[in-house]
């Protein structure tokens, strides 16, 4: 962290990207500025964002590989230059981009002699390879070579116990960390009581997302982390005691949305992202394509607006309401539905 004195003026708090570049397919760089901040705030924001960027961003990677008739991971396979362990290490380095949730299957099936690269991986439609030239193995003889793979979206470093699997399946220590490094520096500006701070934030990613996307996701995760403090229950009110006392009548979807919009005082709806609502991937993608990112965005739409969204169905309409009933606090629903 660096501190310097620079000239500056007090303005409304704002941020912008001052530098962005692509060093390689697997190395993106971005530099951002946030100002003006009061003394001490830059450290607070910088530390929080750095930790969130390095530990809270989700990434997609290969978590398991299954070979046929391989006794252990240190085995060699006839006609292949690399050992099984070396192939597993190469698969661990493959950088993937996706918005999938849960485990997905992929595979490699080729005939030698030839080099196997990431381009040879057969992936589900929702997953793409960042660098198709990443090496996997070298087949030196005319053999058929197949691997079954598992792909998962997660965060952080996931370690599995090493053991031999009789079916030839081996876990891969997954590194779901799209952000490779984060630095921040603080610059002081102004004089006397008018002194403020400017925060510079540098982000390097592996290409599965841009530094700007990583900054957005880290900020959203921090907002999600603090939201419970904004919705603290009133003293003497127990959610467990009241959660089963309210059953909404069979309103039409439009009436429900209208009533939800009536009173926004109890909760900052623009701070509730649709990611938090656990919508199905289909419904979520429909809303995202329509630039609906928060609960406030959703409640600003009429039923007709939603039905005009490409691929949006009547079933999605019902699913949205059922999800709102499930996730919004009971006292909030009482206020907003005003029965």
UniProtKB/Swiss-Prot annotation:
DNA-dependent RNA polymerase catalyzes the transcription of DNA into RNA using the four ribonucleoside triphosphates as substrates. InterPro entries: DNA-dir_RNA_pol_insert, DNA-dir_RNA_pol_RpoA/D/Rpb3, DNA-dir_RpoA, RBP11-like, RNAP_asu_C, RNApol_insert_sf. Gene3D superfamilies: 5' to 3' exonuclease, C-terminal subdomain, DNA-directed RNA polymerase, insert domain, RNA polymerase, RBP11-like subunit. This is DNA-directed RNA polymerase subunit alpha. Residues 1-233 are annotated as: Alpha N-terminal domain (alpha-NTD). One of its GO terms (cellular component) is mitochondrion. It holds the Pfam family RNA_pol_L. GO terms for biological process: DNA-templated transcription. The N-terminal domain is essential for RNAP assembly and basal transcription, whereas the C-terminal domain is involved in interaction with transcriptional regulators and with upstream promoter elements. Belongs to the RNA polymerase alpha chain family. It comes from Thinopyrum bessarabicum. The lineage of its organism: Eukaryota, Viridiplantae, Streptophyta, Embryophyta, Tracheophyta. In plastids the minimal PEP RNA polymerase catalytic core is composed of four subunits: alpha, beta, beta', and beta''. When a (nuclear-encoded) sigma factor is associated with the core the holoenzyme is formed, which can initiate transcription.
């Amino acid at each position: 962290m660096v501190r310097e004195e620079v000239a500056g003026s007090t303005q409304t708090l704002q941020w912008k990207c001052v530098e962005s570049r692509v060093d390689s397919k697997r190395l993106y760089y971005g530099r951002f500025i946030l100002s003006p901040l009061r003394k001490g705030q830059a450290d607070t924001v910088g530390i929080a964002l750095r930790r969130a960027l390095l530990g809270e961003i989700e990434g997609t990677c290969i978590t398991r590989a299954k070979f046929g008739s391989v006794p252990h991971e240190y085995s060699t396979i006839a006609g292949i230059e690399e050992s099984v362990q070396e192939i597993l290490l190469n698969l661990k380095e493959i950088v993937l981009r996706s918005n999938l949730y849960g485990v997905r299957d992929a595979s490699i099936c080729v005939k030698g002699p030839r080099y196997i690269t990431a381009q040879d991986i057969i992936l589900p439609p929702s997953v793409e390879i960042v660098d198709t030239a990443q090496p996997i193995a070298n087949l030196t003889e005319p053999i058929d070579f197949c691997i079954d793979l598992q792909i998962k979206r997660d965060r952080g470093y996931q370690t599995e116990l090493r053991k031999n699997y009789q079916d030839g399946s081996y876990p891969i220590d997954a590194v779901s960390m799209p952000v490779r490094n984060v630095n921040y520096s603080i610059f002081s500006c102004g004089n006397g009581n008018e002194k403020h701070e400017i925060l510079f934030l540098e982000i390097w990613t592996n290409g599965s997302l841009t530094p700007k996307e990583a900054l957005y996701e880290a900020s959203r995760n921090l907002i999600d982390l603090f939201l419970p403090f904004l919705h603290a229950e009133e003293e003497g009110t127990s959610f467990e005691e009241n959660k089963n006392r309210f059953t909404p009548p069979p309103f039409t979807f439009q009436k429900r949305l209208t009533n939800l919009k009536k009173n926004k005082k109890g909760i900052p709806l623009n701070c509730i992202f649709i990611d938090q609502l656990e919508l199905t991937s289909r419904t979520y993608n429909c809303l995202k394509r329509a630039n609906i990112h928060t609960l406030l965005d959703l409640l600003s739409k009429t039923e007709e607006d939603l039905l005009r969204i490409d691929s949006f169905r009547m079933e999605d309409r019902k699913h949205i309401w059922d999800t709102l009933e499930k996730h919004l606090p009971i006292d909030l629903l009482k206020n907003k539905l005003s029965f």
